[in-house]
Curated annotation (Swiss-Prot):
Stated name of the protein: NADH-quinone oxidoreductase subunit D
Keywords, ordered alphabetically: Cell inner membrane, Cell membrane, Membrane, NAD, Quinone, Translocase, Transport, Ubiquinone
Main location: membrane
Gene this chain is encoded by: nuoD
Bilayer topology term: Peripheral membrane protein
Subunit structure: NDH-1 is composed of 14 different subunits. Subunits NuoB, C, D, E, F, and G constitute the peripheral sector of the complex.
EC number, as in UniProt: 7.1.1.-
Length: 403
């Protein structure tokens, strides 16, 4: 037979090509506006191409034309699942450059609300990831608890989601004692809900089949792709900025860093469950310390507004208040990198200041961006149904990825 006519001799079986499908951007398991172009060989993922940018708002560029204080609310809109953790990094960067010492009471409040944010995030992640693999009950329980935490946000600053509560030099206002009592009471009752979720998922045969040995990440991959947070700890590395590079007063707190062993979706789930228990312990310690720590919650100076009582009696205070909210404070020239252990990983701010009242450049390091980069590598060879499980444990939220 002539070689050029070989095509005719191929059977239908031999002519099968790989099949391309779009996963998202309006898919319920896509966690926001993620679009994955998947190349499938039957049910097996051969290639996974993430398309991002559908929620891009140009945050980093917008920040260059706003004062430092006006930029703070942008951080609530990055990872909108746990907003205060992002504000924290911005405040730390400004405080590093200006050399401001945050009062102890403000540091404790920041730690308290950062840990509440961590539980907010993990509750949403664990329960919705369970829903992605077929368990419909946990999200209902998780949202019930998140509602209570949202009310604690609201009682601290007036907003449920976009808080703008952390300020350079401290926090906006002090917490009433009743709020601390209520958070303490909630922290005593919450373990029961965790035990319920634990009982429903941890030893559940179907949940384990859908998560064990899926999306395995090795120590080598972590170094190559720049992972952080639970993606690192799920593979057995005890890397946590709260321990490795303590900020605020985390070095005073007694807590463990949970680590996994296999680096798969199931281990990442277990790490998040244990992290919530550790956060509860930190919350209770912070409340105990707050009952003893008295004093102001803002470092009074050029960065922060004067007390209302002073403004009514002192002309200088009134002028300072007016200048602060019209022109804003000036940050000395320099560059700094400040990072916090956000619920999703290392959230960092690289800030370049030129001595004016606006940042010259602010680069935001979103942990989810680096995790999503590895999606092709992690998903290759898995089945189509496993893609949802992998995205879920990567903890993708598009506000911070697209910025």
């Amino acid at each position: 037979m002539d070689g050029s006519k070989f095509d005719d001799a191929q059977t239908g079986e031999q002519k099968i090509r790989n099949f391309n499908i779009n996963f998202g951007p309006q898919h319920p398991a896509a966690h926001g506006v993620l679009r994955l172009v998947l190349e499938l060989d039957g049910e097996i993922v051969e290639r996974c191409d993430p398309h991002i940018g559908l929620l891009h708002r140009g945050t980093e560029k917008l920040m260059e034309s706003r004062t430092y204080l006006q930029n703070l609310p942008y951080f609530d809109r990055l990872d909108y699942v746990a907003p205060m953790n992002q504000e924290h990094a911005w405040c730390l960067a400004i405080e590093k450059l200006t050399g401001v010492e945050v009062p102890r009471r403000a540091q404790l409040i920041r730690v308290l609300y950062s840990e509440i944010g961590r539980i907010l995030n993990h509750l949403l992640n664990i329960t919705t990831q369970a829903m992605d693999v077929g368990a419909l009950t946990p999200p209902l329980w998780g949202f019930e608890e998140r509602e209570k935490l949202m009310i604690f946000y609201e009682r601290a600053c007036g907003a449920r989601l976009h808080a703008a509560y952390f300020r350079p030099g401290g926090v906006h206002q002090d917490l009433p004692d009743e709020l601390l009592d209520d958070i303490d009471l909630w922290a005593m009752e919450f373990p029961k809900v965790m035990d319920d979720i634990d009982g429903l998922l941890t030893e559940n045969r179907i949940f384990k089949q859908r998560n064990c040995d899926i999306g395995v990440v090795t120590e080598d991959d972590i170094q190559k792709y720049g992972f952080s947070g639970v993606m690192v700890r799920g593979s057995g590395l005890a890397w946590d900025l709260r321990r490795a590079q303590p900020y605020e007063c985390y070095d005073e707190f007694d807590f463990q860093i949970p680590v996994g062993k296999n680096g798969d979706c199931y281990d990442r789930y277990l790490v998040r469950m244990e992290e919530m228990r550790q956060s509860l312990s930190i919350i209770r310690q912070a409340i105990a310390k707050l009952r003893e720590a008295t004093g102001d919650v803002l470092a009074r100076g050029k960065l922060t507004p004067p007390k209302r009582g002073d403004m009514k009696t002192s002309m200088e205070s009134l002028i300072h208040h007016f200048k602060l909210y019209t022109e804003g404070f000036h940050v000395p020239e320099g560059e700094v990198y400040a990072a916090v252990e956000a619920p999703k990983g290392e959230f960092g701010v690289y800030l370049v200041a030129d001595g004016s009242n606006k940042p010259y450049r602010a680069k935001l390091r979103a942990p989810g961006f680096l995790h999503l980069q590895a999606m092709d590598y992690v998903a290759k060879g898995h089945q189509l149904a496993d893609v949802a499980a992998i995205i879920g444990t990567m903890d993708i939220v598009f506000g911070e990825i697209d910025r």
